[in-house]
Amino acid sequence: MKFSDYLDVHPDVEEAIKNGEPIVALESTIISHGMPYPKNIETAMMVEETVRSNKAVPATIAIINGRLKVGLTHEEIEFLATNDEVRKVSRRDLAITVSQKHSGSTTVAATMIIAKLAEIAVFATGGIGGVHRGAEKTLDISADLEELANTNVCVVCAGAKAILDIGLTLEYLETKGVPVIGYKTTELPAFYSSESGFDVDYKIDSALEIAEILKTKWSLGVDGGVLVTNPIPVGYELESSIMNEAINQAIIEAEKEHITGKKITPFLLSKVSEITEGK
């Protein structure tokens, strides 16, 4: 069997691919593991509408009953938002979830893999996974980083998730040869905040110039992704002191409850949201 035998591309996305229209891949973990219902489905629909309003076609990616879905119907988004048995799927889980015909929401890594199969080059998400705090003891490093090193997809986000060790995450990306671009910024944003205290590799002020960089990189045969960081607007960001206090409190609670592995990121993000009252 070919990979296309496992792939279901939404007609709108298929038409856009055929016509060479701009397409933005979107992940689905936020729907099933990132937010409570109904905020999860409202956010998913709002993100898709934002893509459409900027004259591109959204392609939310997930796995439903063992099928790789590129572009979801409203009913499929509702299913992901309300079904407790939906798995969180990264690279290691992909083949098993498909083979056993289960349903799963895709992490950054899994979304990149499926986007590449569908020949979609740009993927937007809130923030990437990375090196967790305390990784020198736990070796807890997200598969997102390895995927960025190997898969030819540009990931646009608001930086690494603030719950991570951002300095070590940047070191890992440097080791793997992943360019970190700041869109109109010299500083790496930190998800909830426009500031992290760490510099990006390159500040680029034009989307067209970024597109030229992508085209050149892959034409040269230099495989791997590119991370484009676009800071959260200042009016929506959390003050660093509030953010760090909430994260530290969430980490303490995770340790008390012995939360580890793939459960740690959704737990911390949910706890930070709870502590900051959804800010």
Briefly describe each language-model feature range.
Residues M1-G20:
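N- or domain-start disorder-to-order transition segments that initiate the globular core
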Residues I63-I64, L68-A121:
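Ligand-binding beta-strand-loop-alpha-helix segment within the catalytic cores
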Residues S105-T107, E136-A149, V153-E174, A207-E212:
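Active-site glycine-rich loop that binds ribose-phosphate moieties when present
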Residues K217, V222-K279:
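A C-terminal functional module that forms or caps the active site or interfaces directly
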